[in-house]
């Protein structure tokens, strides 16, 4: 869960600014700016001491013929069917291995866990660019496979995401009423606000130049920031949402989490003493996170309650 949001903003803003004068060539530069640095896995589920039979590597069919890498971790046979499952999505410039701290507690609680590499990340296929909507597309592809796994109850599925991955889980859940729970870790409230703050720090004036940069990024990713912003999508999510955020987050301010909590009809805010990368800071709250997912996937769906 390494924070790399600034690299996304830097690449997008710098490249898009050039687009204003250099056309096609500069647009190609923008696409490079919208690709995160690929970080290789430095560990895997087997390093957690799990039984070999409980871990499988999957190759999942994604959009536009791309293949997505994933690890599927299953619970003990005694609790294997039927049981809930969770898809876990990393953040920008990260990969599935960096989300491993949540795996063992979830497996012990009887969940199957799908750890997914988004396109342009980890061991998944490359693409012309990465974006939050494309993260959401990859989540949809992963869920299709997860729901079809033997023993998995397709009606008891939760999502966990970090940073851009958290925003993507909220975007997907706002469109998929079958999702039963979302754990959003270090999500930003609005991508446009995040980029405008970066433009201000870089002393790029918003009128004309900054505005044009943001509009070009929207055209490139095929979505308006206002439509995909967590501040908008969290209002449309019909399942319980746990918003986890570090009080000392220097990448996405804690106030973003407070705004999301105020906007969400079924949200709970969990504040932890940490920064944007919460792998270590989350350890004391693992039981709370697992309890939330157990309650949400056991209870009747909110839409049916």
Question: Residues of each region from the PLM?
Answer:
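Conserved alpha/beta-hydrolase "acid-adjacent" motif
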Residues: 250-256, 281
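An N-terminal hydrophobic leader/cap segment in hydrolases
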Residues: 2-61, 71
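Catalytic histidine-centered segment of alpha/beta-hydrolase-like enzymes
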Residues: 275-286
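Alpha/beta-hydrolase fold nucleophile elbow
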Residues: 151-162
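Hydrolase active-site cap/lid region
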Residues: 171-223, 232, 271
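Conserved alpha/beta-hydrolase
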Residues: 103-125
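Alpha/beta-hydrolase active-site loop
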Residues: 129-150
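Short beta-strand/loop motif that positions the catalytic acidic residue
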Residues: 236-238, 243-245, 249
